[in-house]
Amino acid sequence: MCGIAGSFGTKLVKKSDIIQTLDLMKNRGPDFSDYYENKFKSNQVYLLHSRLSIIDLNKRSNQPFKINNYVISFNGEIYNYKELKKILFDKKIKLKTNSDTEVLLWLFIIYGEKCLDLLEGMWSFAIYNNKSNELFLARDRFGEKPLYYSYIDREFIFGSEVKFIKSLSKKNY
């Protein structure tokens, strides 16, 4: 189980609030934690991740994970990722890791939201495209991997636990 959280909007999140949120997330992933931030015109985006290493234990699979202008923060497991790798190999994609995270991100780059039709497993994730300034979120069909979100003061905030949203937004619910 990993932890994911993030924010998308005009609000600048203090580094101390990011660190505090990452500390809250450690119970969901003690192996590694980090964050991605980007400013696009007047918008700010933050993707936070706390990792529990399961499939690929190598640090090259740490998250947030980047390919070109795409960044992902992913919680879950894609059960059929080995079969999906074959699709990528047929398209001459050279993978750099053994992780289902990289497979998922490449599938999204190629197929967009239609990649969800290919997935078997449990997941929640956020993918940000820093060229188009678009954020895409999804969770598995049964909600096995939680994904909470809120739109507060023109700020879209999400997380795998409500307390992560509270920590990033500094609001009480």
Residue ranges and their predicted role:
Residues M1-Y173:
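Cysteine-centered catalytic environments shared across enzyme families
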